[in-house]
Curated annotation (Swiss-Prot):
Enzyme class (EC, first level): oxidoreductase
Protein name: Peptide methionine sulfoxide reductase MsrA 1
Catalytic residues (UniProt): C57
Taxonomic classification: Bacteria, Pseudomonadati, Pseudomonadota, Alphaproteobacteria, Hyphomicrobiales
Annotated function: Has an important function as a repair enzyme for proteins that have been inactivated by oxidation. Catalyzes the reversible oxidation-reduction of methionine sulfoxide in proteins to methionine.
Catalysed reactions, as listed in the record: L-methionyl-[protein] + [thioredoxin]-disulfide + H2O = L-methionyl-(S)-S-oxide-[protein] + [thioredoxin]-dithiol; [thioredoxin]-disulfide + L-methionine + H2O = L-methionine (S)-S-oxide + [thioredoxin]-dithiol
Organism: Rhizobium meliloti (strain 1021) (Ensifer meliloti)
Length: 217
């Protein structure tokens, strides 16, 4: 019964009354990207755009995304919840409401949002609700958080296109990806940043559906 209760708590989003209080102070993290040496927290060059992707554990997702040409910098962090400046330990309780996300700062002149969305939908399973593979909890839910209306429209169109593609291949599950305007983004602790560059044999839980997303190039 205890294990069932713990499972249920980790898969139900908290409300304002049950969310952890957090703190005013930012959690210390790296200042530069371990791979590229670029500023992790900005300022970013003029013309760059941002998007947040939740694909389960952010270690593998971040590596996947920093390797895409046209991506200026990436960072692991937390978003979509209620608790200000959460720690990793707090997010794993399910009581912050946040999901693990990767901040992607990209040059739209070199890589389109469609290209990024195609990678997002193909490289994880966006139909699993409050989990990704063996990683269970609200902190592993699929999410896209955007910064303007144009991005929002593109994200919704990509979701619809991928849902149709899933049905063609007899996948009857519904996409559960949360798509919304971005709220606060909180940088994860230093040891999470570019984790798989520092630990090449570390855990990567990315598993796609095997279905192509029919958008972009």
């Amino acid at each position: 019964m205890f294990l069932i209760d713990m499972f249920n708590k980790k898969t139900i989003l908290p409300d304002a009354a049950t969310a952890l209080p957090g703190r005013e102070e930012e959690i210390p993290t790296a200042t530069t990207h371990f791979v590229s040496g670029r500023p992790l927290q900005g300022p970013y060059p003029e013309g760059m755009k941002k998007v947040l992707f939740g694909m389960g554990c952010f270690w593998g997702a971040e590596r996947l995304l920093w390797e895409i040409p046209g991506v200026y910098v990436t960072a692991a962090g937390y978003s979509g919840g209620l608790t200000p400046n959460p720690t990793y330990q707090e997010t794993t309780t399910g009581l912050t409401g946040h999901t693990e996300v990767v901040l992607v700062v990209y040059d739209p002149a070199k890589v389109s949002l469609q290209r990024l969305l195609k990678t997002f939908f193909e490289e994880h399973d966006p139909t699993q609700g409050m989990r990704q593979g063996n990683d269970v909890g609200t902190t592993y839910r699929s999410a896209i958080y955007v910064y303007d209306e144009e991005q929002l429209a593109e994200a919704n169109a990509a979701r619809n296109a991928f849902q149709k593609a899933l049905r063609v291949y007899n996948h009857d599950r519904e996409i559960t990806t949360e798509i919304a305007k971005a709220g606060p983004f909180y940088f994860a602790e230093d040891y999470h940043q570019q984790y798989l560059a520092k630990n090449p044999d570390g855990y990567c839980g990315l598993r796609g559906t095997g279905v192509s997303c029919p958008i972009g190039a």
